[in-house]
Protein backbone atom coordinates (compact mmCIF):
# COMPACT_ATOMS: atom_id res chain seq x y z
CA UNK A 1 0.00 0.00 0.00
CA UNK A 2 1.21 3.50 -0.81
CA UNK A 3 1.69 5.54 2.35
CA UNK A 4 -0.12 8.85 2.75
CA UNK A 5 3.18 10.68 3.09
CA UNK A 6 3.87 9.86 -0.55
CA UNK A 7 0.76 11.76 -1.60
CA UNK A 8 1.63 15.03 0.10
CA UNK A 9 3.78 17.98 -0.91
CA UNK A 10 6.23 18.32 -3.74
CA UNK A 11 6.84 14.58 -4.14
CA UNK A 12 3.24 13.38 -4.37
CA UNK A 13 2.86 10.26 -6.50
CA UNK A 14 0.38 12.02 -8.74
CA UNK A 15 3.11 14.33 -10.13
CA UNK A 16 3.66 14.02 -13.85
CA UNK A 17 6.78 12.06 -14.82
CA UNK A 18 8.56 12.33 -18.16
CA UNK A 19 8.24 9.13 -20.20
CA UNK A 20 11.16 8.41 -22.53
CA UNK A 21 12.39 5.85 -25.03
CA UNK A 22 15.66 3.93 -24.79
CA UNK A 23 17.50 7.01 -26.13
CA UNK A 24 16.03 9.33 -23.47
CA UNK A 25 13.76 11.05 -25.98
CA UNK A 26 10.48 12.28 -24.49
CA UNK A 27 7.48 10.25 -25.60
CA UNK A 28 4.84 11.49 -23.17
CA UNK A 29 3.91 12.08 -19.54
CA UNK A 30 2.22 10.00 -16.86
CA UNK A 31 1.26 10.31 -13.20
CA UNK A 32 3.91 8.96 -10.86
CA UNK A 33 1.86 6.14 -9.33
CA UNK A 34 0.52 4.92 -12.67
CA UNK A 35 4.03 5.05 -14.12
CA UNK A 36 5.29 2.69 -11.43
CA UNK A 37 2.22 0.45 -11.57
CA UNK A 38 2.71 -0.06 -15.32
CA UNK A 39 6.52 -0.13 -15.24
CA UNK A 40 6.85 2.62 -17.83
CA UNK A 41 10.32 3.86 -18.75
CA UNK A 42 10.78 7.36 -17.36
CA UNK A 43 13.52 9.90 -16.75
CA UNK A 44 15.22 10.00 -13.34
CA UNK A 45 18.44 11.14 -11.71
CA UNK A 46 20.78 9.99 -8.96
CA UNK A 47 23.11 12.42 -7.14
CA UNK A 48 26.31 11.36 -5.36
CA UNK A 49 27.84 13.87 -2.94
CA UNK A 50 31.46 13.31 -1.93
CA UNK A 51 33.83 14.89 0.57
CA UNK A 52 37.48 14.41 1.56
CA UNK A 53 38.72 13.31 4.97
CA UNK A 54 42.23 14.27 6.08
CA UNK A 55 44.03 11.28 7.63
CA UNK A 56 47.27 11.16 9.64
CA UNK A 57 49.32 8.12 8.62
CA UNK A 58 51.65 6.13 10.94
CA UNK A 59 54.70 7.42 9.06
CA UNK A 60 53.76 11.00 9.84
CA UNK A 61 52.41 11.85 6.41
CA UNK A 62 48.88 13.06 5.77
CA UNK A 63 46.58 11.87 3.01
CA UNK A 64 42.99 12.39 1.94
CA UNK A 65 40.28 9.74 1.98
CA UNK A 66 37.21 10.03 -0.23
CA UNK A 67 33.79 9.65 1.40
CA UNK A 68 30.28 9.38 -0.02
CA UNK A 69 27.05 10.60 1.56
CA UNK A 70 24.52 7.76 1.55
CA UNK A 71 20.97 7.61 2.86
CA UNK A 72 18.80 4.88 4.35
CA UNK A 73 15.41 5.23 2.71
CA UNK A 74 12.55 6.07 5.07
CA UNK A 75 10.00 3.46 6.13
CA UNK A 76 7.23 5.38 4.37
CA UNK A 77 8.79 5.16 0.90
CA UNK A 78 6.62 3.43 -1.68
CA UNK A 79 9.40 0.96 -2.48
CA UNK A 80 12.91 0.07 -1.28
CA UNK A 81 12.11 1.30 2.25
CA UNK A 82 14.95 0.74 4.70
CA UNK A 83 17.53 0.16 1.97
CA UNK A 84 20.67 2.21 1.49
CA UNK A 85 20.92 4.46 -1.55
CA UNK A 86 22.95 7.35 -2.89
CA UNK A 87 22.82 10.90 -1.52
CA UNK A 88 19.71 11.96 -3.44
CA UNK A 89 17.50 10.56 -6.18
CA UNK A 90 14.27 11.66 -7.83
CA UNK A 91 12.60 12.59 -11.13
CA UNK A 92 12.52 15.81 -13.13
CA UNK A 93 9.07 17.32 -13.41
CA UNK A 94 7.22 17.94 -16.64
CA UNK A 95 9.02 20.76 -18.44
CA UNK A 96 12.04 20.67 -16.08
CA UNK A 97 15.62 20.03 -17.19
CA UNK A 98 17.29 17.10 -15.44
CA UNK A 99 20.20 19.06 -13.96
CA UNK A 100 17.82 21.77 -12.74
CA UNK A 101 15.76 19.06 -11.03
CA UNK A 102 18.87 17.70 -9.32
CA UNK A 103 19.80 21.20 -8.12
CA UNK A 104 16.27 21.66 -6.72
CA UNK A 105 16.02 18.25 -5.12
CA UNK A 106 19.43 18.04 -3.44
CA UNK A 107 18.67 20.52 -0.60
CA UNK A 108 15.11 19.20 -0.28
CA UNK A 109 16.44 15.74 0.62
CA UNK A 110 19.86 16.36 2.18
CA UNK A 111 19.90 19.98 3.33
CA UNK A 112 22.97 20.61 1.15
CA UNK A 113 22.75 23.58 -1.21
CA UNK A 114 24.75 23.48 -4.43
CA UNK A 115 26.47 26.67 -3.27
CA UNK A 116 28.49 24.38 -0.94
CA UNK A 117 29.91 22.41 -3.87
CA UNK A 118 33.27 22.81 -5.56
CA UNK A 119 32.97 24.61 -8.88
CA UNK A 120 29.71 26.39 -8.06
CA UNK A 121 29.25 29.72 -9.81
CA UNK A 122 26.51 31.73 -11.46
CA UNK A 123 27.03 29.66 -14.60
CA UNK A 124 27.81 26.28 -12.99
CA UNK A 125 25.73 24.29 -10.50
CA UNK A 126 28.69 22.36 -9.09
CA UNK A 127 27.08 19.10 -10.21
CA UNK A 128 28.64 17.08 -13.01
CA UNK A 129 26.73 14.53 -15.08
CA UNK A 130 28.91 11.41 -15.30
CA UNK A 131 26.65 9.24 -17.43
CA UNK A 132 23.30 7.45 -17.54
CA UNK A 133 21.89 3.94 -17.60
CA UNK A 134 18.60 2.08 -17.86
CA UNK A 135 17.44 -0.40 -15.25
CA UNK A 136 14.22 -2.19 -14.35
CA UNK A 137 13.32 -3.54 -10.90
CA UNK A 138 10.06 -5.17 -9.80
CA UNK A 139 8.93 -4.96 -6.17
CA UNK A 140 6.76 -7.17 -3.96
CA UNK A 141 4.05 -4.49 -3.71
CA UNK A 142 3.37 -4.67 -7.45
CA UNK A 143 5.26 -1.50 -8.37
CA UNK A 144 8.11 -1.42 -10.86
CA UNK A 145 10.96 1.03 -11.28
CA UNK A 146 11.96 1.37 -14.93
CA UNK A 147 14.23 4.36 -15.23
CA UNK A 148 16.58 6.13 -17.58
CA UNK A 149 18.77 7.29 -14.71
CA UNK A 150 21.16 10.25 -15.08
CA UNK A 151 24.07 10.14 -12.61
CA UNK A 152 25.40 13.41 -11.15
CA UNK A 153 28.31 13.92 -8.78
CA UNK A 154 29.35 16.84 -6.59
CA UNK A 155 32.17 17.49 -4.14
CA UNK A 156 31.73 19.51 -0.98
CA UNK A 157 34.16 22.42 -0.74
CA UNK A 158 36.81 22.24 1.97
CA UNK A 159 35.35 25.35 3.61
CA UNK A 160 31.76 24.09 3.47
CA UNK A 161 30.05 22.27 6.31
CA UNK A 162 30.35 19.31 6.43
CA UNK A 163 33.39 19.32 4.10
CA UNK A 164 36.85 18.09 4.95
CA UNK A 165 36.99 16.60 8.45
CA UNK A 166 40.02 15.61 10.50
CA UNK A 167 40.92 12.07 11.50
CA UNK A 168 39.46 12.45 14.99
CA UNK A 169 35.96 13.22 13.71
CA UNK A 170 33.30 10.51 13.54
CA UNK A 171 33.58 9.63 9.87
CA UNK A 172 30.61 7.26 9.97
CA UNK A 173 28.13 10.00 10.78
CA UNK A 174 27.49 13.67 10.24
CA UNK A 175 29.56 15.60 12.73
CA UNK A 176 27.52 18.27 14.56
CA UNK A 177 30.76 20.16 15.22
CA UNK A 178 31.06 20.72 11.47
CA UNK A 179 27.44 21.70 11.06
CA UNK A 180 24.54 19.33 11.43
CA UNK A 181 22.89 18.26 8.21
CA UNK A 182 19.12 18.80 8.35
CA UNK A 183 17.91 16.13 5.95
CA UNK A 184 14.30 15.32 5.09
CA UNK A 185 13.05 12.65 7.52
CA UNK A 186 10.16 11.74 5.22
CA UNK A 187 12.71 10.73 2.59
CA UNK A 188 15.53 9.28 4.68
CA UNK A 189 15.68 7.52 8.02
CA UNK A 190 19.43 8.10 8.25
CA UNK A 191 22.24 9.79 6.36
CA UNK A 192 25.95 9.25 6.84
CA UNK A 193 29.31 9.64 5.17
CA UNK A 194 31.17 6.40 4.47
CA UNK A 195 34.52 5.70 2.88
CA UNK A 196 34.09 5.08 -0.84
CA UNK A 197 36.27 1.96 -0.63
CA UNK A 198 34.05 0.61 2.16
CA UNK A 199 30.79 1.08 0.29
CA UNK A 200 32.31 -0.42 -2.87
CA UNK A 201 33.14 -3.58 -0.92
CA UNK A 202 29.91 -3.68 1.05
CA UNK A 203 27.60 -3.36 -1.96
CA UNK A 204 29.21 -6.51 -3.37
CA UNK A 205 29.08 -8.41 -0.07
CA UNK A 206 25.58 -7.28 0.93
CA UNK A 207 23.70 -6.29 -2.25
CA UNK A 208 20.29 -6.84 -0.64
CA UNK A 209 21.01 -3.94 1.73
CA UNK A 210 21.04 -1.48 -1.17
CA UNK A 211 18.47 -0.10 -3.59
CA UNK A 212 18.35 -1.74 -7.02
CA UNK A 213 19.86 1.24 -8.85
CA UNK A 214 22.69 1.89 -6.40
CA UNK A 215 25.39 -0.41 -7.76
CA UNK A 216 25.12 0.57 -11.46
CA UNK A 217 24.88 4.24 -10.50
CA UNK A 218 27.91 3.88 -8.19
CA UNK A 219 29.94 2.36 -11.02
CA UNK A 220 29.27 5.44 -13.13
CA UNK A 221 29.75 7.95 -10.30
CA UNK A 222 33.17 6.56 -9.34
CA UNK A 223 34.66 6.21 -12.80
CA UNK A 224 38.07 7.86 -12.93
CA UNK A 225 41.55 7.56 -11.48
CA UNK A 226 40.63 9.32 -8.23
CA UNK A 227 38.52 6.36 -7.12
CA UNK A 228 40.22 3.34 -8.62
CA UNK A 229 37.52 0.86 -9.63
CA UNK A 230 35.01 -1.58 -8.24
CA UNK A 231 35.81 -5.27 -8.19
CA UNK A 232 35.41 -6.50 -11.82
CA UNK A 233 32.77 -8.95 -10.54
CA UNK A 234 30.47 -5.97 -10.01
CA UNK A 235 29.90 -5.34 -13.70
CA UNK A 236 29.11 -9.01 -14.32
CA UNK A 237 26.48 -9.01 -11.57
CA UNK A 238 24.53 -6.00 -12.80
CA UNK A 239 21.04 -6.57 -14.21
CA UNK A 240 19.64 -3.80 -16.41
Task: Please describe what each predicted stretch is.
Residues 1-3, 33, 82-84, 129-240:
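Nudix hydrolase/Nudix homology domain
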Residues 13-15, 43-45, 88, 148, ...:
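Residues that flank catalytic or metal-binding motifs in active/ligand-binding sites
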Residues 44-91:
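A glycine-rich, hydrophobic loop/mini-helix early in the fold
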Residues 21-22, 63, 176:
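Short, acidic, Ser/Thr-enriched surface-loop or helix-capping motifs
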Residues 5-55:
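Acidic, metal-coordinating catalytic segment for phosphate/diphosphate chemistry
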Residues 49-57, 111-115, 155-161:
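Short regulatory "switch" loops immediately downstream of catalytic or recognition motifs
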Residues 70, 85-129:
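The catalytic Nudix box helix
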Amino acid sequence: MVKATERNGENALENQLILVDEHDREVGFCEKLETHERGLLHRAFSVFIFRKVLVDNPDGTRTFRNQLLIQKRAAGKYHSAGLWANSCCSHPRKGEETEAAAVRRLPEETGIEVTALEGFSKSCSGLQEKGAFIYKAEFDNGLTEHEFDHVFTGWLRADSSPGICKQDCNTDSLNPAEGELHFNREEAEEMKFVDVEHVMRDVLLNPDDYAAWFMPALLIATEGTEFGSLNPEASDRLIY
